[in-house]
Curated annotation (Swiss-Prot):
This is Bifunctional protein HldE. The gene is hldE. PROSITE patterns: PFKB_KINASES_1. The active site is at residue 264. Residues 344-477 are annotated as: Cytidylyltransferase. InterPro entries: Bifunc_HldE, Carboh/pur_kinase_PfkB_CS, Cyt_trans-like, PfkB_dom, RfaE_dom_I, RfaE_dom_II, Ribokinase-like, Rossmann-like_a/b/a_fold. Transmembrane segments: none annotated. The lineage of its organism: Bacteria, Pseudomonadati, Pseudomonadota, Gammaproteobacteria, Enterobacterales.
Length: 477
């Protein structure tokens, strides 16, 4: 299946469910406790990450989509930490605070990337009045393109049928990550995403793909489901839809370190893709690719558009194209080991024109490899105004990566690329325009490391702003 990334900036998703805080304590283990036959971990690093439905919202926000999160918390430090982490990634939190209950927290102790123990701090939210959550859903539905109900059986979805009815009446697709064997609770959902063990707990052991299909279709009929996606670990995913042939997708995972939160990534990608205008088939393809990325990370994690693009295009395997910072560092190290000269430049590159192409070709001629660092969408808006960029980051990077002159493309979030240039330290830093070398962001760091800084002229008569103005004038004529 040939799939391109949708413009996730168009997507608005409502996530409702059981939110929790995941805490991680990391440290080495070198001895056994004299008090009991257990390892002693010397804790050196502590991390806090949103978990459960909050991790689903994080996955959506990491794509550049808008996520609104509704759930139940206590009034405690864990709730404040959860809100802080989510605010940092621009997830809109609309929590219902229950003073008498603690925020659900899961503490994991790890050593050498191995989880030794998990401690759960929770009492659940059974018996809580569903009215405030239902009111928040009603308020949000007119603004969103998809709803996720993330069920961890902690009480936030006690009135799940009422939630499904609200979404269906509003004509908004409702996707559910189920919990337990009572699928009657999810009657009328647009899409259910059980893993294989959850699916078999309801329909019985399946000994072939055909049995999965037959029993899945029967399940859809029984509970009035529009579609069913069974996630099958190393065997990939199976999508079932009414009146359409089953779609089997093999796994794209290369290495599996941790499956924590993989289901959150899948349903988050599905909803964001659908809300951005993708078909269900396309959304499942992207979700499968995202799952292959996230299981290669430790702990609850998210997937960026760059990582997703690499996964569906295979660019990480070729060693060229759109890259993460760590991938680029490796590629640059290998290039230097081959004796190649690395050139780096940066810019917005919103509407690519002949001046850009000429400039990049000239920069490439100055060395053996060319890195182009690209302003993120937020960075571009701060520099160019709220109407820019015209093209989202992923599209801008894809166009640049397709140019013969460009070897590697990487984004940066700041207003200037100084940090990333200081991290990469190219042999030659190039900038177009009338700058002086000492005025160029990152130039001092490159020179201090023994590199060079040069200024190249832009081709006269070529300007993104002029192109935009011409288009606007044409629209007004």
């Amino acid at each position: 299946m040939k799939v391109t990334l949708p413009d996730f900036r168009r997507a608005q998703v409502l996530v409702v469910g059981d939110v929790m805080l995941d805490r991680y304590w990391y440290g080495p283990t070198s001895r056994i406790s004299p008090e009991a036959p257990v390892p002693v971990v010397k804790v050196e690093t502590i991390e806090e990450r949103p978990g459960g439905a909050a991790n689903v919202a994080m996955n959506i926000a990491s794509l550049g989509a808008s996520a609104r999160l509704v759930g139940l918390t206590g009034v405690d430090d864990a709730a404040r930490a959860l809100s802080t982490r989510l605010d940092e990634v621009h997830v809109e939190c609309d929590f219902v605070a229950i003073p008498a209950q603690p925020t659900i927290t899961k503490l994991r102790v790890l050593s050498r990337n191995q989880q030794l123990i998990r401690l759960d701090f929770e009492e659940g939210f059974g018996g809580v009045d569903p009215g405030p959550i239902l009111a928040r859903i009603r308020q949000a539905l007119p603004q969103v393109g998809a709803v996720i109900l993330s069920d961890y059986a902690k009480g936030a979805l006690a009135s799940v049928q009422a939630m499904i009815c609200l979404a269906r009446d509003a004509g908004v697709p409702v996707l559910i990550d189920p919990k337990g064997t009572d699928f009657e609770r999810y009657r009328g959902a647009t899409l259910l995403t059980p893993n294989l063990s959850e699916f078999e707990a309801v329909v019985g052991r399946c000994h072939s793909e055909q049995e999965i299909v037959d029993r899945g279709l029967a399940l859809m009929e029984r509970f009035d489901l529009t579609a069913l996606l069974v996630t099958r670990s190393e065997q990939g995913m199976t999508l079932l839809q009414r009146g359409i042939a089953p779609l089997h997708m093999p796994t794209q995972a290369q290495e599996v370190y941790d499956v924590t939160g993989a289901g959150d990534t899948v349903i988050g990608m599905l909803a964001a893709s659908i809300a951005a205008g993708a078909s269900l088939d396309e959304a499942c393809f992207l979700a499968n690719a995202a799952a292959g990325v996230v299981v290669g990370k430790l702990g609850t994690s998210t997937v960026s558009p760059i990582e997703l693009e690499n996964a569906i295009r295979g660019r990480a395997d070729t060693g060229f194209g759109v890259m993460t910072q760590e991938e680029l560092k490796t590629a640059v190290l290998q290039a230097r080991q081959r004796g190649e000269k690395v050139v780096m430049t940066n810019g917005v590159f919103d509407i690519l024109h002949a001046g850009h192409v000429s400039y990049l070709a000239n920069a490439r001629r100055l060395g053996d490899r060319l890195i182009v660092a690209v302003n993120s969408d937020a960075s571009t808006s701060r520099l160019k105004g709220p109407e820019r960029p015209v093209n989202p980051l992923v599209q801008r990077m894809l166009v640049l990566a397709a140019l013969e002159a460009v070897d590697w493309v990487i984004p940066f979030e700041e207003d200037t690329p100084q940090r990333i240039i200081a991290e990469i330290l190219p042999d030659l830093l190039v900038k177009g325009g009338d700058y002086k070398p000492e005025e160029i962001a990152g130039g001092k760091e490159v020179i201090a490391a023994g590199g060079e800084v040069r200024v190249l002229n832009f081709e006269d008569g070529c300007s993104t702003s002029n192109i935009i103005n011409i288009i606007r004038q044409g629209q007004n004529d």
